[in-house]
Structures are given as structure tokens and as C-alpha cells.
């Protein structure tokens, strides 16, 4: 059964259930869908030719059927032309490509059934066979017409020609051709995509941009639809119905009306007579008295809710007048008549419609309140009446002085008071203009409580007290004094710093004659430097060792001692340093410098490279060694990179390696005895 008839019959139930007055038949709907499918239009967004939902479904199904037949026919033609589906758009995974390949492979199965008479393949290619007689014809076309059997040699010859041609897509009698949307390359075998956008055979209209695809193209809109519109699947702009979607902002008493690209809010109700509608749709009263002009003489307009009324005008007298006895006119009021007049004890003068008060000294008449008011002399004449403070009183003013002054005999100026005559301060007093200042002797400060009592300054407790004395600070009344550790230090001449006692220099050490005295901060150490076997001491034996002294043991081999000669260590050096416990360790401290001249560049050998290393004694990884060049010298710099809190003792074993071509030719060992004091000074 034809696919289009299947579509029409499957929709019969829907037709019976749907009442419509549409005059367009389902055949017309299907024919329109088939036409648009032949034009390769998008079947999911076809222009409607009827308001009927059934017609729209028939359009889409008939359009899809035409597209599917076209896609399947391409696969069947490839199978017939090339007897192979391998070259079908290799690597593509689109739905169209999969359908084309499936129909191609099912056609090959149908052809094989005819040649080798295998079991029917209808169960395997059921969907492809339902596409029409195309797949079934793959077997039928192989049968000879009118009962004449084709020559086996002719069929074999055609198949051999296509196999030898090596066509990429289609082959007919050894001649290659391409699918729709492709063209044959100059080699006559392979196919390349046709760029419809570049060559011009596309259907994109003005405002759409053509985008080339493999074997086809698509049209994309270039300009957005703008506010109030949305882009549909068929690349068209459609008005957004804000009223239907509920995206409008109309108030509850307003009704939303959709317009092209926008919407309007219209009032739901009409206002009664005497009312007008505001911007929010509410009915508000009209004040008719603002616009009414046809009033009779002697009448007044009074606005009411939704209307207005007219009343006869009555006689009203202004301020300072009252109605006469007849009630026909206004006459003056004598405000000064009687003992209780309006001037409240001041002189009163009656005027027509008013009055005026004759005020006493220190008062002024207020024409608005019609009364005598006190004159504030202090505010009217600031700084001109009193030297310090001015206080207004009823009808006059008086002067006063600030603290530290007393009023002069003239009642306006102020004289300074000498407060020091009463000895208010505990130590010293200095009179100043209008006050006094207490001061204290050195080592004392004024109390924050009263500002006159002198209190002892605890210099040791001040924020900088930790820096006043090197070791310990002891407060005394009005002063302080510093002390140093019980041994190893003495107080300097400034009375604050602690100086180390050099026991080695003063001879107060206890080292034997075979030992060397080394002074450290706060003490001394007796050091004994012994050279290892096959090494001898270089230089004289010293009774004391300074920081810069280095005791060296150089290699001295016995005759024919091969192991000694081959030993790469040329020397063992000893030195000692004393370090404080750094109070503020903010950056690495350079403590030891190992200097060596730059190796001489000999013409017959490579110059060795000096490499420094820490072998032992690097407690807590507190030390590091780097190499740098300084004035033609290679310097190994030992740095303290982490703080150490004394007392700490360690022996830092350093190696100075001479490396030539990656091999250590010889090395020098340096033993540095490090003593870290528990104090920072």
C-alpha cells in the first residue's frame, strides 16, 4: 500500500472525532506536503494552508514520506550503480546518511538473494521494503525481461568495469557519477561538495545568510527579530502574545490587549458621571467648582463626591471688624478699650481695623502677633555688649565670665584669675590666661583622673619599655635602671645596653694550653682542633680563636700511600661563629662567607666548577648555602633562613666541590661551629 494512503487512513479516526467546517480536503493537504518535501523544505515548520490540526499533521507526514523516499532512493541507486556502500559519505553520522546506507545495504541483500538464492531478507529489511518497490526491484531488476536469461559474461563484465573504475559514490557501466549536492572531480572518480552559497543556486531570501553543508546548505536569519517578537523554527519572526503568556504588567483593574510587537492596558470599567479615570484605571472625583463659572451673584460653589452644590454668600467681617447691630455692615473694633487691652501693660493706640502698641524700653512691637516682645540684645549685638558671655533677661541683659576669669567693675569686661596662688598642683603650677597648667618633674606624669596630681612613670611598662634596656628594666620613683645577665655581660656606659665580656681577651677563661679559647656572646668555649690521619695543621697554633680565624688541616700523604693520594678531600678547615637569637627575623641573615679565586683557564684542561653543599649539622633546615661572584672571587654564602631560639649549638659541615666534566676532581671540607646565644644582644 502506498505510504500516502497509509497516512490518510491512519488519520481517519482523528477526522471522525474532530468537527470542522474547513473546505480543504486531506488530499489537498497531502499534495501540498509532498510538493514541499520535493523542494527539501523543513517538514516540521510548513506554512499552514488550513486552520485544521488534521490538515497540518497530514502535511507533515506526506512531506516526511517524500523526503524519506528520496533519501532511500539515493541508497538504492548507489547499490545498483556501484554494488558497494563503503564510499557513502564515510565518517558522517547524520540521520539522512544512516537511512541512505541502510537502503543501500538492503538493496545489496536483495540482489544477493537473486544471485545465490538465499532465504528471503524481508524480515531484515522490512522498513526499507516498505519504502516502495525500489528495494524489491533490486532483485526484480536482476531477472531477465520476457524470460530471457542475461549473459553471465555480460553481468560479470559490468561488475568488473565498476570495480576497476574505483568510483567514490556512483558507477554505471564503468562511468563514475555523484550524488545530489556533489560534483565529480577532475580525476573522474572522486566527488567533492558543491558550495551552493558560493555558486548561487540556493533559495535564501534577503535578510538570510546562506551556510554551506555537506551535500546541501541551510538559510539562517541575519537580523534579530527585536523586542516583542521571537524567531520560529522556520526562520521567521513571530509576534509574542504577552497577554496570553502573562508577561504583561497590566494592573488587576486593567485588561491586556495584544498588539504587534507589544501590548496595551485598557480599563475594565467605565466611570459614572462626576468621575474621571486616572492612569491606573481608578475613578476619581471631578472638582466641578474649578471650572464652573455660571454662578449667580452672591452664591458660592461647594464640591461634593461626584457632583457640587451652590449656596448663597453670607457677610463675613475681616480681622479688626465686626457686624453692626443690624448685621448689614462691618465696623471697627476698639482693641484699646477697657483695662485688659491687647498690649498687656504697654501703651495702646487704636487704628481703623487694627491697633498699635507703644512698647517700653527693651521691647519691640510685632506687627504680626500685634504684641510687645522682648528684645534679645545678646543676639542682636553679638560680641559688642559683653567680653565673654551675654545672657538675655526680660527687657534687658547681663554679662558673665568663663572659668578662670571674674567680672570687672564695669560689669562687662573680665579679669584673669591667678589659680596658682591657691597651690592646686602637687608639684609645679604655671598660671596662664584664664586658667593654669600643672606640670611634673622628670620621671613623673600628670594623672588622667584629675590632671593636677603627679604620678610616677613606669618606663619599663611603656610600649617601648622592651627597648629601653637590653636585658631587664627595673622601675624606680621618677626613674629606672637596667641590669644584665649574671655572667658573661657587663652594663655599658649608657646604663642601658649589655656588652659581652670577652673572657678570651681578658684571660678569665679556663681553657688549657692545648685548647683554643673562642669567645661567644655571654660566655666562651674551649675548642680543640685535631687533624685527621694523613692531614697536618697549616699555620701556628693560636691560644684564642676569633670569628674570622680559620684553622686548616691540609693533606699530607705518606710515600706510596695510593689511597691517600686518590682521596679527593684536599683539606679540612675549622672555624667558629657566635650568633644572637634574632628578636625580629624578617629576612635571611648571611653568616659565613667562603671565598675562592676564579679557577685559571688552562689551555690543556677544562676549568672546574665550584659547587657548595651542606653535609651535616643543618638542624631544622635553618641554614642554606648559595654561590655568587663578587669582585672576581667565587663566594659561597651561608645564610640563616629560619629563626633559632638559643641556646643552640651545632657543627655545620660544608663541602666545596671542584667539578670537572660532571666529576668531582677534589673537594675541601669546612667545619663551622655555630653557637646561638639565648639573648638578642
Curated annotation (Swiss-Prot):
Annotated S-S bridges: 29-55, 30-62, 43-63, 72-103, 85-104, 106-125, 107-138, 114-139, 162-171, 167-176, 178-191, 197-210, 204-219, 225-237, 243-256, 250-265, 271-283, 289-301, 317-330, 336-348, 343-357, 359-372, 378-390, 386-399, 401-414, 420-429, 440-454, 460-473, 469-482, 484-498, 504-517, 511-526, 531-553
GO annotation terms (biological process): embryonic medial fin morphogenesis; extracellular matrix organization; mesenchymal cell migration; skin morphogenesis
Chief place of localization: secreted
GO molecular function: calcium ion binding; peptidase activator activity
Entry GO CC: extracellular region
Name of a matching Pfam family: cEGF
Subcellular localization: Secreted, Extracellular space, Extracellular matrix
SMART domains attached to this UniProt entry: ANATO, EGF, EGF_CA
Cleaved signal peptide residues: 1-17
Domain spans labelled EGF-like: 158-192, 193-238, 239-284, 285-331, 332-373, 374-415, 416-455, 456-499, 500-554
Ranges of residues in domain Anaphylatoxin-like: 29-63, 68-107, 108-139
Glycosylation sites: 173
Family assignment from sequence similarity: Belongs to the fibulin family.
Free-text function comment from the UniProt entry: Incorporated into fibronectin-containing matrix fibers. May play a role in cell adhesion and migration along protein fibers within the extracellular matrix (ECM). Could be important for certain developmental processes and contribute to the supramolecular organization of ECM architecture, in particular to those of basement membranes.
Protein name: Fibulin-1
Lineage of the species this protein comes from: Eukaryota, Metazoa, Chordata, Craniata, Vertebrata
Record gene name: fbln1
Amino acid at each position: 500500500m502506498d505510504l500516502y494512503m497509509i497516512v490518510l487512513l491512519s488519520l481517519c479516526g482523528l477526522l471522525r472525532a474532530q468537527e470542522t467546517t474547513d473546505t480543504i480536503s486531506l488530499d489537498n493537504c497531502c499534495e501540498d506536503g509532498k510538493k514541499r518535501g520535493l523542494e527539501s523544505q523543513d517538514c516540521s515548520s510548513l506554512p499552514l494552508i488550513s486552520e485544521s490540526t488534521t490538515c497540518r499533521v497530514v502535511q507533515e507526514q506526506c512531506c516526511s514520506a517524500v523526503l524519506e523516499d528520496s533519501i532511500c532512493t539515493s541508497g538504492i541507486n548507489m547499490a545498483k550503480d556501484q554494488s558497494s556502500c563503503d564510499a557513502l559519505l564515510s565518517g558522517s553520522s547524520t540521520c539522512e546518511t544512516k537511512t541512505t546506507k541502510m537502503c543501500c545495504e538492503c538493496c545489496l541483500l536483495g540482489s544477493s538473494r537473486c544471485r545465490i538464492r538465499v532465504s528471503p531478507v524481508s524480515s531484515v529489511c522490512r522498513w526499507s521494503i516498505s519504502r516502495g518497490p525500489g528495494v524489491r526491484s533490486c532483485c526484480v531488476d536482476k531477472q531477465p525481461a520476457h524470460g530471457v536469461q542475461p549473459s553471465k559474461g555480460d553481468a560479470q563484465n559490468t561488475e568488473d568495469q565498476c570495480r576497476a573504475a574505483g568510483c567514490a559514490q556512483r558507477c554505471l557501466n564503468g562511468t563514475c557519477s555523484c550524488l545530489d549536492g556533489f560534483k565529480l572531480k577532475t580525476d573522474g572518480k572522486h566527488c567533492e561538495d558543491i558550495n551552493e552559497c558560493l555558486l548561487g543556486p540556493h533559495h535564501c531570501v534577503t535578510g538570510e545568510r546562506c551556510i554551506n553543508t555537506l551535500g546541501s546548505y541551510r538559510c539562517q536569519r541575519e537580523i534579530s527579530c527585536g523586542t516583542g517578537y521571537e524567531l520560529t523554527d522556520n526562520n521567521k519572526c513571530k509576534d509574542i502574545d504577552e497577554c496570553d503568556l502573562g508577561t504583561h504588567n497590566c494592573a488587576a483593574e486593567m485588561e491586556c490587549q495584544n498588539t504587534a510587537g507589544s501590548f496595551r492596558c485598557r480599563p475594565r470599567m467605565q466611570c459614572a458621571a462626576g468621575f474621571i479615570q486616572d492612569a491606573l484605571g481608578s475613578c476619581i472625583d471631578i472638582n466641578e467648582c474649578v471650572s464652573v463659572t455660571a454662578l449667580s451673584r452672591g452664591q458660592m460653589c461647594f464640591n461634593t463626591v461626584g457632583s457640587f452644590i451652590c449656596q448663597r454668600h453670607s457677610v463675613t467681617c475681616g480681622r479688626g471688624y465686626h457686624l453692626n447691630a443690624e448685621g448689614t455692615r462691618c465696623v471697627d473694633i476698639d482693641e484699646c478699650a477697657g483695662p485688659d487691652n491687647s498690649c498687656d501693660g504697654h501703651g495702646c493706640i487704636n487704628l481703623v481695623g487694627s491697633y498699635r502698641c507703644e512698647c517700653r524700653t527693651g521691647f519691640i512691637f510685632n506687627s504680626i502677633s500685634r504684641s510687645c516682645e522682648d528684645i534679645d540684645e545678646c543676639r542682636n549685638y553679638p560680641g559688642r555688649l559683653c567680653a565673654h558671655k551675654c545672657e538675655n533677661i526680660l527687657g534687658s541683659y547681663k554679662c558673665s565670665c568663663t572659668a578662670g576669669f571674674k567680672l570687672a567693675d564695669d560689669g562687662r569686661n573680665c579679669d584673669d584669675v591667678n589659680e596658682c596662688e591657691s597651690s592646686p598642683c602637687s608639684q609645679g603650677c604655671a598660671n596662664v590666661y584664664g586658667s593654669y597648667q600643672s606640670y611634673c618633674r622628670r620621671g613623673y606624669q600628670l594623672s588622667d583622673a584629675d590632671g593636677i596630681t603627679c604620678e610616677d612613670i613606669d618606663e619599663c611598662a611603656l610600649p617601648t619599655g622592651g627597648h629601653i634596656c637590653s636585658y631587664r628594666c627595673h622601675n624606680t620613683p621618677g626613674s629606672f635602671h637596667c641590669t644584665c645577665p649574671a655572667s658573661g655581660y657587663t652594663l655599658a656606659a649608657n646604663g642601658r645596653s649589655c656588652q659581652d665580656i670577652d673572657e678570651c681577651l681578658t684571660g678569665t677563661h679556663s681553657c688549657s694550653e692545648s685548647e683554643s679559647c673562642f669567645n661567644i656572646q655571654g660566655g666562651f668555649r674551649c675548642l680543640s682542633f685535631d687533624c685527621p690521619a694523613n692531614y697536618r695543621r697549616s699555620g701556628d697554633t693560636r691560644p684564642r680563636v676569633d670569628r674570622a680565624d680559620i684553622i686548616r688541616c691540609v693533606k699530607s700523604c705518606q710515600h706510596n700511600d695510593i689511597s691517600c693520594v686518590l682521596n679527593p678531600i684536599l683539606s679540612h678547615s675549622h672555624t667558629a661563629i657566635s650568633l644572637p637569637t634574632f628578636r625580629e627575623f624578617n629576612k635571611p641573615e648571611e653568616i659565613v662567607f667562603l671565598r675562592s679565586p676564579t679557577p685559571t683557564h688552562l689551555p690543556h684542561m677544562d676549568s672546574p666548577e665550584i659547587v657548595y653543599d651542606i653535609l651535616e649539622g643543618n638542624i631544622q633546615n635553618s641554614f642554606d648555602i648559595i654561590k655568587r661572584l663578587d669582585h672576581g672571587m667565587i663566594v659561597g654564602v651561608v645564610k640563616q633562613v629560619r629563626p633559632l631560639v638559643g641556646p643552640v649549638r651545632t657543627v655545620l659541615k660544608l663541602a666545596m666541590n671542584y667539578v670537572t666534566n660532571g666529576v668531582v676532581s677534589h673537594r675541601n671540607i669546612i667545619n663551622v661551629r655555630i653557637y646561638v646565644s639565648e639573648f638578642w644582644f
